[in-house]
Design a protein with these regions (language model features):
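Mature catalytic core of soluble alpha/beta enzymes
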Residues: 2-11, 18-357
Length: 357
């Protein structure tokens, strides 16, 4: 049973919010809503639920007519996330993704489920659009850098070269007619961390809607699937706090509904090795953790799209990244970089339309 909070019929902007994991000093999602008040049914109550999923705390905030409906909807949403994790996880030994990775180099195509096919297909398209900057075959490199962080020691050029030999999105062969995937090179390891969470959040929101709860927000690790606005509000309120003054009051407010929201970057997830700072995000071309200190926010029609774009922008930078966003329908992005002591902010032309009115 998911842990739940007591219902609150009239939240205020000062109430406790959802902290985006790893970005708490910069991004705060308030559980109160924002915007001008409009007449809404008074019967709806606000409920919160939290449960560990995909190695992160997943939180659901929803408005429902009763505790029973809220409980049923949240339970079903968390169950859906757990089921997807068993497909997408690269930690579980018996997940569908792990079994596919184990088949690498076998020379045989492997039938995959509709859920895994959807992500593999999106990954291939995003890799092509980004000229390989987005690449789910980075698993061997991710493993190298996880070990480097634990041991506090840079990987050797030989270790990186060996891992890179097993990386490359073109090494995955998809057959759309047979719905199969084949990993050409032995020792390949797929890592869906850049998109699996977005898909899971979208699906959780879809389940809530199917249970008659459209006024909801689902968040995990700084990413969100956002449904209809809370009662009497225009949208869910997002605070953007200044990066150059941690702990300072927020300087900007967004109002969001019916969209996906994703964050990526190294401002709060990095490691210093050999006197240099490296991001947890790996550049598939160089095999190295990113060293360009950046933080990216993407707003898109769904969290899956936002998730894939935010990671890609971190790798290719603001100029190419915002061009990619401009070519994606209804997507906008904000890129914050910190070269030296100054903070640089670049935004899509349409990002300002999400500002709270």
């Amino acid at each position: 049973m998911p842990r739940r909070a007591k219902p609150n019929k009239s939240p205020s902007p000062g109430q406790r919010g959802i902290l985006a994991t790893g970005l708490a000093a910069w991004l705060l999602v308030l559980l109160a809503a924002s915007g001008c008040r409009t007449p809404q049914p008074a019967a709806l109550q606000r409920f919160e639920f939290e449960q560990p999923q995909m190695g992160l705390p997943f939180r659901i905030v929803l408005y429902a007519e009763s505790q029973a409906r809220a409980d049923d909807a949240a339970r079903a949403a968390f169950a859906r996330v757990a089921a997807l994790n068993h497909v997408f996880s690269d930690y579980e030994d018996d997940s569908e993704l792990t079994l596919l990775s184990r088949s690498s180099g076998s020379g045989r195509p492997v039938p995959v489920s509709d859920e895994l096919w959807r992500l593999l297909n999106l990954a291939e398209a995003t890799s092509r659009r980004s000229q390989g900057a987005f690449d789910i075959t980075v698993g061997p490199l991710v493993q190298v850098w996880r070990r480097a962080r634990r041991q506090r020691e840079l990987p050797t050029p030989e270790v990186l070269a060996e891992a890179k030999a097993r990386v490359g999105w073109q090494k995955v062969v998809l057959d759309p007619h047979a719905r199969t995937a084949q990993l050409r090179v032995p020792g390949m390891r797929l890592d869906l961390g850049s998109i699996a969470k977005g898909r899971a959040l979208d699906e959780a929101l879809h389940v809530l809607r199917a249970h008659g709860v459209p006024r909801a927000l689902v968040t995990g690790g700084g990413d969100m699937a956002i449904g209809d606005a809370p009662p009497g509000r225009d949208g869910w309120r997002i605070e953007l706090a200044p990066l150059d003054a941690p702990g300072a009051p927020p300087t900007r407010f967004l109002s969001l509904r019916n969209c996906g929201f994703a964050t990526s970057g190294d401002f709060f997830q990095h490691v210093e090795l050999g006197g240099k700072r490296y991001s947890h995000i790996v550049n598939p071309h160089t095999g190295l953790g990113l060293t360009d200190h950046s933080l990216v926010v993407v707003i898109a029609p769904d969290c899956l799209t936002a998730n894939s774009l935010s990671t890609t922008i971190c790798v290719i930078g603001p100029e190419r990244g915002l061009a990619l966003v401009a070519a994606t329908p209804a997507a906008s992005a904000r890129v914050v970089r910190k070269p030296g002591e100054r903070v640089e902010v670049t935004e899509s032309p349409g990002f300002a339309r999400f500002d709270e009115k």
